[in-house]
Amino acid sequence: MGTEWHKPKLSLALVLLTLEAGWAQEGSEPVLLEGECLVVCEPGRPTAGGPGGAALGEAPPGRVAFAAVRSHHHEPAGETGNGTSGAIYFDQVLVNEGEGFDRTSGCFVAPVRGVYSFRFHVVKVYNRQTVQVSLMLNTWPVISAFANDPDVTREAATSSVLLPLDPGDRVSLRLRRGNLLGGWKYSSFSGFLIFPL
């Protein structure tokens, strides 16, 4: 004897809002419908395309994610050859949903206000050397990670953080000390929007 699976039936209340066009009359009662809930709309949120909303069948706005890797060694800190001391650049962008990551500067620029998750994984090249990497929010270091075991040739400095960002905030990595190994795409930087604020 098998157990049958039944989809739950929900009563949906359609609240008619008074629109400028005057579609609803004052004092009208909510309409109750029996059926299956297919779409839940939050009050005050647009349901058509445009800023703040997407039409049914479209991708929702605010989809933001990036992942980038290095494919070659980084110069020692302060000797990047491009005039930007210690900035870490990623020459291969694997994902750039929302176009927030700028390959030229190595920075992620927040397109929308929200809470974001960031992660980096940086591998040192040589033993007897310390690698120090800082995740920067605009010009301020937020977190740092170290790899400094003298007996390990390939050790990783890895960290992650959740940050509330405003539009235009810049998040990047800065190499404070050491060299990076990226020949096998071991050094990476990624982030995504968890939810808008």
Swiss-Prot record:
SUPFAM superfamilies in the record: TNF-like
Keywords, sorted A to Z: Disulfide bond, Endoplasmic reticulum, Glycoprotein, Golgi apparatus, Secreted, Signal, Synapse
InterPro entries per the UniProt record, alphabetical: C1q_dom, Cerebellin_Synaptic_Org, Tumour_necrosis_fac-like_dom
Positions annotated as glycosylated: N82
Protein name as annotated: Cerebellin-3
Annotated C1q domain residues: 59-197
Entry keyword annotation includes Signal: yes
Region (Necessary for interaction with CBLN3, and homotrimerization): 64-197
Subcellular location: Endoplasmic reticulum; Golgi apparatus, cis-Golgi network; Secreted; Synapse
Name of the encoding gene: Cbln3
Subunit structure: Heterohexamer; disulfide-linked heterotrimers. Interacts with CBLN1. May also form oligomers with CBLN2 and CBLN4.
Tissue-specific expression: Expressed in brain, restricted to the cerebellar cortex. Within the cerebellum, expressed in granule layers (at protein level). Also detected in postsynaptic Purkinje cell spines (at protein level).
Signal peptide residue numbers: 1-24
GO CC list: endoplasmic reticulum; extracellular space; Golgi apparatus; parallel fiber to Purkinje cell synapse; synapse; synaptic cleft
